[in-house]
Amino acid sequence: MISAEEALYQSCYCEENVYKLIEKIDDKNGIFAIIISNDCKMIPLWKQKAAKSINGHVLWDYHVIAIEKEKNGSKVYDLDSTLEWSCDFLEYWEKTMNLAEMAQRDTKFRRKFRVIPGENYISLLSSDRSHMLSKNGVYLKPPPEWPLINSHKPSNLMELIRMSEQIENTTVMDEPELFQLFSK
């Protein structure tokens, strides 16, 4: 795996950051892109750089991370996290998902996860960045300097975020299912 310093990063473009990370990895076996969202597009995540306080959370409409599944456990790669790069999955899960706090929240905030094998994510994701444009056609946040992702195909980011969508080579999981997959 590459270091955090080698990873390309642009704030508020997590789907592209993960794409660029996976793209740089020669052996994509065991690497997964994980899209986190829910029906109301409001997912609380803790230990995020965008949080207004140390113990606070961010309410994203979606977030994308990479997970590397290994024999001795899994590692999480989240460039927006305040946790270390290549964080142990169990630590990331405990501190970022914060299930104790989530138990006190409305069920509409429960997160779902679209799990996509790394190789599939590289060929599947297509983004024209239109979701980051204001009504006036101005970017809400500065776009990455690299070219659009798979711009020869129609943009499909919004479909990938909708957890009700059936998309080939992807699996939608709830919190217990994702935990079971990567906690071993």
From Swiss-Prot:
GO molecular function: protein-N-terminal asparagine amidohydrolase activity; protein-N-terminal glutamine amidohydrolase activity
Its biological purpose: Mediates the side-chain deamidation of N-terminal glutamine residues to glutamate, an important step in N-end rule pathway of protein degradation. Conversion of the resulting N-terminal glutamine to glutamate renders the protein susceptible to arginylation, polyubiquitination and degradation as specified by the N-end rule. Does not act on substrates with internal or C-terminal glutamine and does not act on non-glutamine residues in any position.
This enzyme's EC code(s): 3.5.1.122
Enzyme class name: hydrolase
GO CC annotation, single: cytosol
Family to which this protein belongs: Belongs to the NTAQ1 family.
Keyword Nucleus (UniProt): no
Self-association state and partner proteins as the record states: Monomer.
Keywords (A to Z) from UniProt: Hydrolase
Catalytic activity: N-terminal L-glutaminyl-[protein] + H2O = N-terminal L-glutamyl-[protein] + NH4(+)
Annotated protein name in UniProt: Protein N-terminal glutamine amidohydrolase
